[in-house]
UniProtKB/Swiss-Prot annotation:
It comes from Mus musculus (Mouse). Coiled coil: none annotated. GO terms for biological process: inflammatory response. The gene is Nlrp4e. Signal peptide: none annotated. The lineage of its organism: Eukaryota, Metazoa, Chordata, Craniata, Vertebrata. This is NACHT, LRR and PYD domains-containing protein 4E.
Length: 978
């Protein structure tokens, strides 16, 4: 079907207007063009244009979507609702056509693609409860409205794709979202990744029933679009691109990672809605970079579902209860059973062991043990004790395939990959029969492991059996590289890989491997792992990069009572996020053996706030006590960071009791985004610790009464807090009055960060305190505080009178050139003591640089100026560079990121490099510098009198010639920040 717009055209609509209406349309059109700041069309041309001429003029001067948007807006102003409704009916026609197509696709093609074995599950009628569940998925609990971005989190195999399929099917049948969405488009990230480059229009066209997708029409109502993005983890995009790299053109081809970032970071189609499925690890990696309005968790099987499944598999009810209790008491194994296919694996594995007359307790020791038992049983006939040579070769080939997949992020394998790793065509049917492999629905003759975790354990077995140099793929790296990659969470799809390696080193697992493969394993692997852990223990920088939870699971799976304290007593800093009860158990298991810690950073999210049955709560609190015990067992612990955590009263009291212990000598306490479901006074009792020097409460909600309690502590003579950070704590202007007494009376407080609070009217109170002769504050951060014009006069007075304030950050406020002029009036005074000024994102233009230049020429104390993300342009930089060359200027660092600069300003910058004897660093990232400009900068830096280090250049932002030039310069000077 051709596009609705090309079928009926603008002229068709304009023909519906009478002569008087047509003239009115032209007048409103001129107003609309001016208001939108669009390319001008002369009134003479518009006035004399016929309906056909005017339609052609609009389509010639503006893109089709913009022309139609303006036309519909003018129709609305003219009260021609009938024309709007007619367009809506035509658009709805396409929507209905698409719904019919989607339903057909879901019940046929997608049933295979989503690995749904029983298509009847898609043909069943949806109940009202089903529909309510789907609708609620896209309703925010906080606002009750439709959110723009919903993340559906869940581990692999939990059923996310099936849930999305059913939701789309319900929409295609007209049962949900009928007044909300005209179109729902499904993008499978496996398919998107294969495309390498694509436009959004291309992705939509692939989903359309024929070759002529009405793209302009579909995109004309972006608020009526829902994009379902499935398996985001496959894309491996971290959303870290600069804003300038993102794209807002739906028709433009981009690398698919850029396209995905542009959609999810709301650069493209910000009015549309998104439902995104991903693993928890993926969401954790990108949550700070996207505006996610809702997060939904898919929990999988609950306890009763797991119990029902076990009872359906075992005949003896008493024996079943025994087996289920064994699983339920092992929290790690119980968590595995929440994934349906893994629940089947665990249950069938235990059943086989019982049938063979073995004790199931031993294989439930750790999950590594259960996985290896399950896999080895697949290759050993029921009546045999040992596998055949063929079975050994098949498993060895399978493990080689798994390792290649883990290192290349491959989870769907073509037959060629199987052959490359020693799996013969004749072996495939056997591997399918035992259900360790399944046919993939992605493409013909391709295969997947039953579950990604089975691929991980097979890959781990490969590394225990052979060296990476024996693998047919060079992508497979050493055991050392594996461990560091796992512990640093470089590859987010590696969930168990590293911990399985450690688990396989347990004596019982070594015996199983040796029995299956018929030869003794080398102890070299164990030595290499020990060496890795020794490297970590002796390297503070490396410890900062290690994910504590990954390390804990490795040590837990290894289950070596002698080795555990050796490792833990070498750690000086640990950071971890516990997301469930299992995580807390494993963290407690390791941390109670640690006595050398200096810094601990933790998050327990909602685990310690949820109401649970009594026995569960008691066990959880015991584990939490063991976690907190590190605060008293480690005699040198100075830093505690608690983030993104909700505490009930009992849980907080456990932490409180350890922090109040006399041997706890904290100097730094950070409590960020923490909610106390108890009396907040307990928190403020903690900060009365006289050893405390830094307190960070940012992102933690503080009531007015909380602020009073905080300031009461700060006003105490015994308080030694030098640095206070209360950014984004929901502070109000009235709270500023409470801080007045602290600023005047405290002789210790030197740094105060109040950023991201709405303080506008409170600045007058703060300023009076800052002007007081007893105020000793040195650093003040007021970034993103919604400051208005009046505030600049108050702060100007502070800069004139305060003789201790050396750093001021007022970034992300509407300072503008006028406000900057007021501040610069104070900064040009000869007795100004300010050393550092940050005015990023302050709407400063070229004009404001005149006042900054005057400051640089007169203020000999200013060393650091951060002016990034202001449109100062080349002319503004010229003014600054001329001032930097002045003998009175002692500037050392300047930040000019994203200042709309071009290569034309580089000569001025180069000149300042060679004339200013104090300038050490300049950041120019996110500016459109060209080859000749960069050559000029690097030539200047080669001069003997130049001390400047250029920062922020990213090689990939330039053309090939410039990239080669930068690489050559980097080779000459490895210290360059490129």
């Amino acid at each position: 079907m051709a596009s609705f717009f090309s079928d009926f055209g603008l002229m068709w609509y304009l023909e519906e207007l009478n002569k008087k209406e047509f003239m009115k349309f032209k007048e409103l059109l001129q107003q609309e063009i001016l208001q939108l700041g669009l390319k001008h069309i002369s009134w003479t041309e518009v006035k004399k244009a016929s309906r056909e001429d005017l339609a052609n003029l609009l389509l010639k001067h503006y893109e089709e979507k913009k022309a139609w948007d303006m036309t519909f807006k003018i129709f609305q102003k003219m009260n021609r609702q009938d024309l709007m409704e007619r367009a809506g009916r035509e658009i709805a026609g396409h929507s209905k056509l698409y719904q019919v197509h989607l339903k057909k696709k879901l019940t046929h093609d997608y049933a295979r693609k989503f690995n749904i074995k029983d298509q009847d599950s898609l043909k069943q009628k949806f109940t009202q409860d089903d529909c309510d569940h789907f609708e609620n998925l896209l309703i925010s609990k906080a606002t009750g409205k439709k959110p723009h971005m919903v993340f559906l989190q869940g581990v692999a195999g939990i059923g996310k794709s099936l849930m999305l399929t059913k939701l789309m099917l319900a929409w295609s049948e007209g049962m949900v979202f009928q007044n909300k969405f005209s179109y729902i488009f499904y993008f499978c990230c496996q398919d998107v990744k294969k495309m390498k480059r694509a436009s959004l229009a291309e992705l939509i066209s692939k989903e359309w029933p024929n070759a002529s997708a009405p793209i302009e029409e579909i995109l004309s109502q972006p608020e009526k679009l829902l994009f379902v993005i499935d398996n985001l983890e496959v894309m491996e995009c971290d959303m870290s691109e600069w804003e300038s790299e993102l794209c807002d053109d739906c028709m433009e081809k981009q690398p698919v990672n850029i396209l995905m970032s542009s959609l999810l970071r709301r650069k493209m189609l910000p009015e549309s809605s998104f439902l995104v499925s991903a693993t928890p690890e993926t969401f954790e990696k990108i949550e700070d970079r996207i505006e996610c309005t809702n997060v939904k968790m898919m929990a999988g099987f609950n306890e009763s579902s797991i119990k029902v499944y076990f009872y359906s598999l075992f005949q003896d009810r008493n024996r079943t209860q025994e087996i289920f209790s064994l699983v339920r008491e092992n929290e790690q194994l119980f968590s595995v059973c929440q994934v349906p296919v893994l629940c089947w694996m665990v249950a069938t594995c235990l059943k086989k062991e019982i049938e063979k007359g073995r004790d199931p307790v031993s294989i439930c020791r750790r999950i590594t043990s259960l996985y290896t038992t399950y896999i080895f049983n697949l290759f050993i006939p029921h009546s045999a004790q040992y596998p055949s040579k063929k079975s050994q070769d098949q498993l060895q080939g399978l493990c080689s395939l798994a390792a290649e997949g883990m290192w290349t992020d491959t989870f769907v394998f073509a037959e060629e990959a199987l052959r490359r790793n020693g799996i013969m065509d004749s072996d495939i049917s056997t591997l399918l029969d035992v259900r360790i492999l399944e046919k993939s629905k992605e493409s013909e003759k391709s295969y997947i492991f039953l579950h990604p975790s089975i691929q991980e354990v097979c890959a781990a077995i490969f590394h225990l059996l052979k060296s990476h140099v024996d693998h047919p793929s060079q992508d497979v790296k050493s055991i050392e590289a594996l461990i560091f990659t796992f512990l640093k969470k470089v590859k987010i799809q590696w969930i168990f890989f590293g911990s399985f390696i450690f688990g396989l080193l347990h004596e019982s697992e070594q015996k199983k491997l040796e029995a299956f493969f018929g030869h003794q394993l080398s102890q070299e692997i164990k030595r290499q792992l020990y060496q890795c852990l020794e490297t970590i223990s002796g390297n503070k920088e490396l410890q900062e990069q290690i994910d504590g939870m990954k390390l804990f699971y490795c040590l837990f799976e290894m289950d070596d009572e002698a080795f555990l304290p050796q490792v833990m007593n070498c750690m000086e800093q640990i950071k971890f996020v516990a997301k469930d009860y299992s995580d807390v158990i494993v963290a407690a298991h390791c941390l109670q053996h640690c006595s050398t810690l200096k810094k601990l950073s933790l998050s327990t999210q909602n685990i310690l706030s949820e109401g649970q049955e009594h026995s569960y709560t008691e066990k959880l609190l015991i584990c939490w006590h063991h976690v907190c015990s590190v605060l008293t067992s480690s005699k040198d612990i100075h830093v505690l960071q608690v983030k993104d955590t909700n505490f009930n009263e009992r849980a907080f009291l456990v932490l409180y009791s350890h922090l109040k212990y006399p041997s706890c000598i904290l100097k730094v306490l950070e409590v960020n985004n923490v909610t106390l479901l108890c009396d907040n006074r307990l928190l403020f009792e903690l900060i009365q610790n006289q050893r405390l020097q830094l307190l960070n409460l940012s992102l933690t909600f503080l009531s007015h009464n909380d602020v009073k309690l905080l300031c009461d502590v700060l006003n105490q003579a015994e308080c030694n807090i030098e640095k206070l950070m209360v950014a984004d704590c929901n502070l109000s202007p009235d709270d500023c009055k409470v801080f007045v007494s602290v600023l005047i009376s405290s002789k210790m407080l030197k740094h105060l960060n109040l950023s991201s609070n709405n303080l506008d009217k409170g600045i007058s109170s703060l300023s009076k305190a800052l002007c007081h002769p007893d105020c000793v504050l040195k650093n003040l951060v007021l970034a993103k505080c919604s400051l208005s014009e009046e505030c600049w006069h108050y702060l100007s007075e502070v800069l004139r009178r305060n003789k201790t304030l050396t750093h001021l950050d007022i970034s992300f406020n509407d300072l503008k050139d006028e406000g900057l002029k007021v501040l610069c009036g104070a900064l040009t005074l000869p007795d100004s003591v300010l050393i550092s000024l940050s005015v990023r994102y302050c709407l400063i233009t070229t004009s404001g640089c005149q006042d900054l230049a005057e400051v640089l020429r007169n203020n000999q104390n200013l060393r650091n100026l951060q002016i990034s993300n202001n449109k100062i342009e080349d002319a503004g930089v010229k003014l600054l560079c001329d001032a930097i060359k002045h003998p009175n200027c002692h500037l050392e660092n300047i930040g000019l990121e994203a200042c709309a600069l071009t290569g034309a300003c580089c000569e001025d910058l180069a000149s300042s490099f060679t004339h200013c004897k104090t300038l050490l660093g300049i950041n120019l990232q996110e500016n459109a510098l060209d080859h000749s400009g960069l050559v000029a900068l690097f030539e200047a830096m080669k001069q003997q009198q130049c001390t400047v280090n250029l920062r922020g250049l990213r090689i990939t932002d330039f053309d090939k010639e410039t990239q080669e030039f930068l690489m050559a310069e980097k080779e000459k000077n490895p210290y360059l920040s490129i």
